[in-house]
């Protein structure tokens, strides 16, 4: 699908030839004298249109309007959140087969984040998964035009939104694929395709290399599957070489049966989504390739299956992690933290500015936060605030959870340095406390996305979250780093003329000012 941005007032929008013209009208709308304004004013006066977000009035073959259909759409207070809500409420109309060309016309100036939110909402509403269907109907919408009062002012947000659509849909695609179509090897192949984008390189480690690295916990989880593990390493390098990278670590369990501690059969099919953390890292890199911010980012994805087999780990087994710490496997279904702990240890060698792991880690987080917010755990307050603010800006929110030391008491083991689970109570927190044992000396955050990575029921499928949160965080960090870049010294002043001589005539020489240089 193609997105276009243009300056378009309501008067000119009437001449736009399209299958569907959406006129987005906020509260406090002041109508003009054009056909669409008159139409909206009459609908409001007669009570046929309300401006609460999502309320709408659909019209056909409107005189003096070129569009086949017109929908007057209320967008409430006109904020990014309200615009997103309104467009998603109209998803069925956007997704109709006859809607191939869509024009969105904003009846008032855009508020912060609206252009990006609108692009993403249209993409989400029209998304169709087709990869493993023999006769699937592909997305019918081929072009969407955003008509705004000031295209130049909306351009940065629009471009960010288009890049986020690319990243989110890449993540959704790989999350939605069945496990036999998204094995660790296939996931690694997907990562390699990202290496074609600007500033991105990809390296894939196989089982022998992972064993040589000493990733005993990761190797132990993968033993029960015939599919070989993969450790994926993505690098986005667009800043100075000496700038410390931000590391993203994504959990890549491409199917989680629970292992010997096997899960109940109902809804086990959804355990293909246990690699949504990995998919979100891939999605972030896809977006970075479009946006090309001046920052260094490293993506690490430990990918494997968790299956029962004669070689699989058993409850009571003790394994040695890459850090040298030993772990008693009390529950083989607490496997995500085992592959993450080795990846976190590996991340330390890059001396990162921050490390963020992303994982569908615990059902306890779903109980705590449902499908609204990711669970955020962090050992650094500034990092936690930055991620929270990024989530709010991206409409991809998270909520900080506690990390009191007392929560780690349940991880004590009689036979190893720690157990891999501490029971049901506070399960999301104790899982984070386990990971915290492997991030000494690093600024670290953990996003538990078990509740927000995918949906069950009639709308079953991956959401692509938290790609938006992570990209907004990285863009904010790139901007902050650019502002902190060293200031070039001013050119030395010309020597003063000798006092005995007459003053020289002043020329039109330009004077060099202070110049900020990007890292």
From Swiss-Prot:
Question: Residue ranges of region Disordered?
Answer: 487-519
Keyword Protease assigned to the entry: answer is yes
EC annotation from Swiss-Prot or TrEMBL: 3.4.11.1, 3.4.11.10
Keywords carried by this UniProt record: Aminopeptidase, Cytoplasm, Hydrolase, Manganese, Metal-binding, Protease
Annotated GO CC locations: cytoplasm
Q: Check the record and name the InterPro entries matching this protein.
A: Leucine_aapep/pepB (IPR011356), Macro_dom-like (IPR043472), Peptidase_M17_C (IPR000819), Peptidase_M17_leu_NH2_pept (IPR023042), Peptidase_M17_N (IPR008283)
- Cofactor note text: Binds 2 manganese ions per subunit.
**Binding annotation for Mn(2+) 1:** 256, 333, 335
Q: What does the record give as the active site?
A: 263, 337
Q: Which Gene Ontology BP terms does the record give?
A: proteolysis
What is its subcellular localisation? Cytoplasm
The protein's annotated catalytic reaction(s) are: Release of an N-terminal amino acid, Xaa-|-Yaa-, in which Xaa is preferably Leu, but may be other amino acids including Pro although not Arg or Lys, and Yaa may be Pro. Amino acid amides and methyl esters are also readily hydrolyzed, but rates on arylamides are exceedingly low; Release of an N-terminal amino acid, preferentially leucine, but not glutamic or aspartic acids
Q: Which residues bind Mn(2+) 2?
A: 251, 256, 274, 335
Free-text function comment from the UniProt entry: Presumably involved in the processing and regular turnover of intracellular proteins. Catalyzes the removal of unsubstituted N-terminal amino acids from various peptides.
**Name assigned to this protein:** Probable cytosol aminopeptidase
Source organism lineage? Bacteria, Pseudomonadati, Pseudomonadota, Betaproteobacteria, Burkholderiales
């Amino acid at each position: 699908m193609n997105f276009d941005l243009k300056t378009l007032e309501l008067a000119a929008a009437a001449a736009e030839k399209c299958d569907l013209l959406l006129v987005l009208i906020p509260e406090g709308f002041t109508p003009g004298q054009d056909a669409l304004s008159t139409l909206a004013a009459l609908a409001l006066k007669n009570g046929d249109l309300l401006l609460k977000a999502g309320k709408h009035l659909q019209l056909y073959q409107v005189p003096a309007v070129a569009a086949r259909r017109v929908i007057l759409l209320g967008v409430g207070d006109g904020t990014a959140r309200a615009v997103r809500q309104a467009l998603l409420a109209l998803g069925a109309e956007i997704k109709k087969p006859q809607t191939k060309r869509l024009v969105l016309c904003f009846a008032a100036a855009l508020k912060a984040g609206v252009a990006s939110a609108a692009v993403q909402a249209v993409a989400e509403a029209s998304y169709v998964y087709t990869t493993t269907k023999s006769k699937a109907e592909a997305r019918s919408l081929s072009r969407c035009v955003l008509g705004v009062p000031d295209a130049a002012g909306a351009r940065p947000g629009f471009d960010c939104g288009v890049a986020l659509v690319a990243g989110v849909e890449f993540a959704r695609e790989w999350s939605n694929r069945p496990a036999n179509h998204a094995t660790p090897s296939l996931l690694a192949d997907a990562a390699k395709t990202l290496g074609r984008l600007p500033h991105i390189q990809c390296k894939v480690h196989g089982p022998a290399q992972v064993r040589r690295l000493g990733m005993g916990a990761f190797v132990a989880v993968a033993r029960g599957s015939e599919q070989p593990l993969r450790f994926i390493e993505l690098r986005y390098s667009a800043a100075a070489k000496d700038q410390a990278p931000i590391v993203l670590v994504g959990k890549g369990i491409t199917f989680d049966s629970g292992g010997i501690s096997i899960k109940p059969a109902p809804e086990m099919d959804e355990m293909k989504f246990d690699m949504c953390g990995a998919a979100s890292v891939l999605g972030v890199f896809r977006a970075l390739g479009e946006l090309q911010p001046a920052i260094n980012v490293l993506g690490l994805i430990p990918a494997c299956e968790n299956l029962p087999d004669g070689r699989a780990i058993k409850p009571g087994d003790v394994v040695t992690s890459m850090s040298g710490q030993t772990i008693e496997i009390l529950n083989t279904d607490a496997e995500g933290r085992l592959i993450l702990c080795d990846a976190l240890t590996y991340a330390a060698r890059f001396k990162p500015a921050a490390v963020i792991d992303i994982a569908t880690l615990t059902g306890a987080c779903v109980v705590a936060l449902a499908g609204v917010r990711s669970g955020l755990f962090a050992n650094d307050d500034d990092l936690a605030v930055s991620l929270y603010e990024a989530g709010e800006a991206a409409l991809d929110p998270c909520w900080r959870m506690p990390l009191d030391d007392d929560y780690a008491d349940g991880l004590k083991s009689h036979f190893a340095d720690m157990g891999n689970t501490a029971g049901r109570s506070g399960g999301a927190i104790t899982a984070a406390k386990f990971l915290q044992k492997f991030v000494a000396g690093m600024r670290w955050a953990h996003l538990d996305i078990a509740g927000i990575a995918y949906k069950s029921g009639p709308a079953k499928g991956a959401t692509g979250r938290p790609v938006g949160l992570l990209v907004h965080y990285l863009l904010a960090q790139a901007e902050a780093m650019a502002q902190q870049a060293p200031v070039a010294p001013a050119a030395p002043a010309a020597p003063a003329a000798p006092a005995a001589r007459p003053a020289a005539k002043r020329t039109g020489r330009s004077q060099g000012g202070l110049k900020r240089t990007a890292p």
